[in-house]
Amino acid sequence: MAMPLCSLTSYNPITTTLRGHHFLTINAYVKTQCIPCFFIKLHTRSSASKQRIIDLRSGSSNIVACVGEGATSLSSHSDIMKTGKREEIPPGVWKDDISDSIMSSHKPEADEKRVEILIAEIKSMFRGMGDGETTPSAYDTAWVAKIPALDGSDHPHFPQTLQWILQNQLQDGSWGEGTYFSAYDRLLATLACIITLTVWRTGQTQVRQGIEFFRKHAGTMEDEADNHQPIGFEFVFPAMINEAKSLCLDLPYDTPFIKQIIEKREAKLKMIPTDTLYTVPTTFLHYLEGLQEIIDCQKIIKLQSKDGSFLSSPASTAAVFMCTGNTKCLEFLNFVLIKFGNHVPCQYPLDLFERLWAVDIVERLGIDRHFKKEIKDALDYVYSHWDERGIGWARENPVAYIDVMATGIRILRLHRYNVSSDILKTFRDENGEFYRFPGQSERGVTDMLNLNRCSHVAFPGETVMEEAKLCTERYLWNALENVNPLDKWDLKENIRGEVEYALKYPWLRRLPRLETRNYIEHYGANDVWLGKMMHMMPYINDRKYLELAKLDFNNVQSIHQKELRELRRWWKSSGFAELNFLPDRVAEIFFSIASSMFEPELATCRAVYTKSTLCTVILDGFYDVHGSAEDIMLFNEAVKRWDHSLLDRMPEHIKTCFLALYNVVNEIAEEGRKRQGHDVLPYIRNLWEIQLESFTKEAEWSRAEHVPSFHEYIEAAAISSALPTLVLIGVIFTGEVLTDHILSQIDYRSKFAYLMSLTGRLANDTKTYQVERSRGEVASAIQCYMKENPELSEEEALEYIYRLMENALADFKREFLKTKDVPEYCRRLVFDNARSMQLIYMEGDGFKLSHETEIKEHVKKILFEPVA
C-alpha cells in the first residue's frame, strides 16, 4: 500500500515514471503534516524533463507537481497543470461584495420623459440647420453699420445695426463676446464700435466708456498670449487705429503694443504676393477691410463668392461694398440681416461646419443611435457639396480649411461615403508639415487633433495620411509640454485631456463606451470659437447634448449592471467557479462586449457573447494546461456525440466543463432558433468542434515541445484566437436574419474575420509570450518566427511581429471601411472585437492581470461608476 504523502516528515527520495518516458527522482522536503500544499525541492537527471509532470497517486487523491529546479507547490489536479506548467493568476477584482457596493442605484425609468424631450429638441435642432447658427459679432455689425444710405442722406443704410451697437455695450464699456474675456477680441470689437458711433455722431456716452476701456487694456496687451489673437488681427487692428487717428479719437497710440502691431503689419504687407492676390482665393479675402490701402477693389471682385460675400465675412464684404458699390455685396448683407435681424455674425454661412460638428458631437457622446435619420440627412447635405479640391466652413467657400476637410473625410468614410484624402496634400509644405490653410503657416491644437483623428481612417498606401499622422503626433506631443496648451481657434476648457486621450488611445484601441465616457468629461457646452472674432455656435455647443449624453450613459450602465448580476449568478451555477482554472473574470469579459455592443436591444448578444467567451477561456485553459491527452480525447468525443453517455467516464472537472458547455450551447441554440426562425444548433456545434480542434492542435504542440513553422502557427491562430467563434455565435443575436452572403463576409471565408483573428492573436502574443514561455509553452508568433530566422534576436523578432500587426491592422481598417453589404451590428461586432484585443493587450494581459493594468479603471468607469 502506498504511503500517504501527508505522512512524510523527513527527506525521502521518490522515484516515479512519467507516462513511461522519464525516470525522475524528487527530493521531497515536507514542511508540515496533512496540509493541502507542500513545498518540494525538485531535481531531474534530464534537462529536457524540467517542465514535465509527476503524477503521484495517494489513496483516492491525485497529487501532481512540476519537475524542475527550485521550490514549487503541490496540490490537486485542479490547481496544477497536468502538462507541468503552473500559472499563477491573481484573484478576481470584481467580487460580488465589491461590485454590488459600487453599482449605481440609478433607475432609467425615472429619466424616460426627460430623455424623450431632449431627443425631440435635438432632432428639432438638426432639422433647423440651415446656413448655420452663430452668436452676434459686434465687430462685423459695426462695419455693416458704417455703410451710408444709398440715397445720399446722412444716415446709415442699415440703421438697425447702429441701434444694436448702442444697445449691446457690455458693463465694462467694451463690446465683444460676453461669455469669455479675451483682450484681443474686446479691443478689436470696441475699436470698431467707437469708430462707427463717431462716424454717425451718436452715442457719445458709449464712445467715452469704450475709449476708457481701450485705454485701460491697451497698455497691458504685451502680456496677452499670442494664441488668442484673432485671424487677421495684425492687418485690421492697425488699419482701424489709423482711422481712429483721422477721427481724432483720444486713444493711446504710442503704447508699445500698438507700435509693435503696426510694425508687424508693415512687414507682412511687404510679404503679400500681389501677383496672386487677385487670381487665387486665399484667407486674405476674409479680412479685406484691413488691406484697403493695398488692394484694388475692382480687381478683387473676381474672387467674390457666389453668394456675394468675400469668404463669408460680413465685415470684409461691407468694406468692398463701400469701395465699389457692388450689388452682389449688398445682396449678401441684406440676406444676412434678413436672417439675424439687427446684427450680423463674424462669418456666414457656416452650413458645412455646423453639420459636420453636430454629427461628430452626437456620435462621440454616444447618443447617435437616437438621430440616425438626422445624421444621414446632414451627411448627405455635406456630401452633395463635397469638392475634392477642398471645402471650407460653407458650401460656397472657395478656400479649403483643414479642420473641415479632416473632419469631413473621417466622418464620411466612417459612414461609407467615397472621399479621397488627396486634398490634404495642399495643406502640406515642403518639409511635410501641415497647416490650417493651403500656403500658410498657422495651425492650432484643434486643427492638428482633428487631422490626427482623420489619419486613423487611412487606407493602406495613403502616404499623405501617414505623413499627417506623424506630423500631428509630433505637434500634439509638443503642445502637451506646455503647462496649459490653449488652442488658438477653439478655446476649449479641456483641450489637454482630449489630446492626451487621442494620443494614448488611437482609433484601433478606442472602444465606443470609453470614447463616450471620455468625451462626456471633456465636452464643453460653453466652448468659444475664435475666428476673426470670438463666437459661439448654439447648434454645436449646447447643454442639451451633454444632458442627454449623461442620462443615456447612466441609463445604459444601469441596464448593463442588471445583466452583469445575472451573468455572475450563471457563473456560479455553471460550476466553472469551482475549477480554479480561471479566477472570476466575468466583469472584465462582459466589459469587452458591453463597451462596444452597448445598445439596450443587444442584451441577448452581450449575454451570449460573455457566456461563450467564458467557456472559451475555461476550455483553452483545460486544453492548454489542465487536461491530459486522454482527457482531451474524451472531451472531444463527448462534444462530437453531444450527449451525456460519456459523463460517467469523466473526472469531475471534465464533467463540469462539458456540462457547462452543453447547457450554454443548447440555451443559445434555443434562443437562436427563435431569432433566426430555424434550428441553429448544428451551426453552433460545428463552430465549437472547429474551435476545439484548434485547441487540440496547440495542446499537442505544447506536449511535444514542438515549435511549428511561422506560417503554420499563423494559420492555426486564425481559429485558436477564438474570436471568429465568438463573433459567429454573437452575430445570431444582432437582430439580423443571417443569410449565407452575410456570413461569408464575417466568417472563416472572409478576409475581414481573418484579419480580426490575426491581429488579436498577435496582440496577445506580444504581451504574453514571455510568461507562457516561462511555464513551458514553446509556440508563439515570436518564437516561431525566431525558429525560422535564428540570426534574429528576440527584440528583432518582436519588432517584426509588431510591424506585421500594424500592416494587418491597416488592411483590417480598409475591410471595415469598404464593407457596405454587411449589417451595421455585424460589422461592428467584428471590428470592435479586434479593437477590444488591442486595448486589452495594450499594457499586458488585461484579462488575467486586470488589477495591474488600466483595464480595472476602464471596467469601473463603464460598468460601475455613473457620470455626474
Swiss-Prot record:
Its cofactor is Mg(2+). Mg(2+) 1 binds at residues 620, 624. It comes from the Eukaryota. Its EC number is 4.2.3.147. Keywords: Lyase, Magnesium, Metal-binding, Plant defense. This is Monofunctional pimaradiene synthase. The Asp-Asp-Xaa-Xaa-Asp/Glu (DDXXD/E) motif important for the catalytic activity in the class I active site is degenetated, but the Mg(2+) binding sites are conserved. Coiled coil: none annotated. Pathway: Terpene metabolism; oleoresin biosynthesis. One of its GO terms (molecular function) is magnesium ion binding. It catalyses: (+)-copalyl diphosphate = (-)-pimara-8(14),15-diene + diphosphate. SUPFAM superfamilies: Terpenoid cyclases/Protein prenyltransferases, Terpenoid synthases. Involved in defensive oleoresin formation in conifers in response to insect attack or other injury. Involved in diterpene (C20) olefins biosynthesis. Monofunctional enzyme lacking the DXDD motif in the class II active site relevant for the cyclization of geranylgeranyl diphosphate (GGPP). Requires (+)-copalyl diphosphate ((+)-CPP) as substrate, but no activity with GGPP or ent-CPP. Pimaradiene is the major products of the enzyme. Belongs to the terpene synthase family. Tpsd subfamily. GO terms for biological process: defense response; diterpenoid biosynthetic process. Mg(2+) 2 binds at residues 620, 624. Binds 3 Mg(2+) ions per subunit. Mg(2+) 3 binds at residues 764, 768, 772. The keyword Transmembrane helix does not apply.
